[in-house]
Amino acid sequence: MRIIQHNLIKLFLACISVFINVHVNADASPDIWPYLKEQVFKDRVIQEDQNFLKIDGPKRASSGAQVPVTIALSENTHHIKKISVFIDANPGQHAATYFLTDQSQQILISTRIRMETDSYVRAVAETDSGELFMSAVPIRASGGCSGYMDV
């Protein structure tokens, strides 16, 4: 009887430790962005507190293979020439770049991205003068990059 209780306690503790490890590692980490920013933008300043650029996505995606993301540019008074999308924790972190014309005013870009694991998804907008603006959203998803992609 004592052996059964001892084994049940060990099993219970093992289950708790697995749950704690999975829960701790499941959140998107902001620690990746400084390294990615340094590689792509070097020492350029990126402004994060703006209202005209927004990226949005689900808090938890049902599939990492097709995560819906929307990028909204409410007004192009800053003369944005391109918007790049980055997924911090993906093997290939640069997901897309959209080039805008001078005629672009209110922009709404809806797309689907593949995500390997929980990550921040970032939209970085660059102006004609070289200023950078960013909006980011954490999204929980997994397994999208490991699946087959029919091209």
Predicted features by range, described:
Residues 26-62, 96-98:
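Transition segment at domain starts
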Residues 56, 68-74:
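Short edge beta-strand/loop segments characteristic of extracellular beta-sandwich folds
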Residues 64, 116-120:
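Extracellular Ig-like/FN3 beta-sandwich strand-entry sites
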Residues 82-86:
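Beta-strand signatures of extracellular beta-sandwich domains
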Residues 91-114:
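An anionic, turn-rich surface loop/hairpin at beta-sheet edges
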Residues 133-139:
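Edge beta-strands of extracellular beta-sandwich domains
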Residues 142-151:
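Low-complexity, Pro/Ser/Thr- and charge-rich linker/hinge segments at domain boundaries
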